[in-house]
Amino acid sequence: MNDKTRKSSTHYAIGKKNPNLPFHPAVRAGDFIFVSGQVPKDENNNMISGTIEEETLATLKTIARVIADEGATLSDVVRITTYLEDTRDFGRYNKAFLEGIGDAVLARTTVEAKAVINTKIEMDAVVYKPLPSGK
């Protein structure tokens, strides 16, 4: 379900907002989509807990689902920031990330973050997907 809260025809929220959180899954601002921190969830919005590889791939799929309503895919991602619970997982995370991101050309930052709760990983993203003509 897509809950679009509009400020204008080119600036609006994307995705169903959790009523307990003060932000939306993503926000469109012109030709860019800013994706809030996402964690590994399945299609039914249930948390996935597994290896760093499983959680990395699941988090990328979560991002893909968030941006799909705007016609965007992971190949449209231009920047990802990853928050790892433990940087000792970096090598395994990096391998899974490369597998999951495909041929996207992007910038990336990865940092250790102890505030990541009940998961090994969280990612936010910036997506470039021009608005269709006439919007």
What is the predicted role of each segment?
Residues 1-61, 65-78, 84-135:
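N-terminal presequence-like segments and the immediate start of the first folded domain
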